[in-house]
């Protein structure tokens, strides 16, 4: 997402809390992207569910890369003062889930992402492809 789009989007937030959760999602997306994760997507769940404001979904080519992307996301979020509440790995780490309460980050291998298809479950939600 380009900076001008990000600024315009932030102006649409009703509260400072909404702007903060979007910044958290952006931090996670940027970290994943910089670790060469592909197809990074932000899903805006505000008003649809009570357990999170955003999902950040990213793909990695290998299980090793999913772990490295997850480590980078955690480090960047901690730098911003946000620690993960939980970290869940499926068998073989093809899917890593990081729960930062208002933002949940899902890092998949390409095969796992095709199998679980989270974006299609939330097709009614606003979805943005991360681009820098």
Where are these regions (language model features)?
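Long, contiguous binding/interaction regions
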Residues: 1-47, 61-68, 75, 80, ...
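Structural motif
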Residues: 102-104
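Short hydrophobic/aromatic beta-strand micro-patches
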Residues: 57-59
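Active-site beta-strand termini and strand-to-loop segments that position acidic
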Residues: 98-100
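Short amphipathic alpha-helical segments
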Residues: 52-54
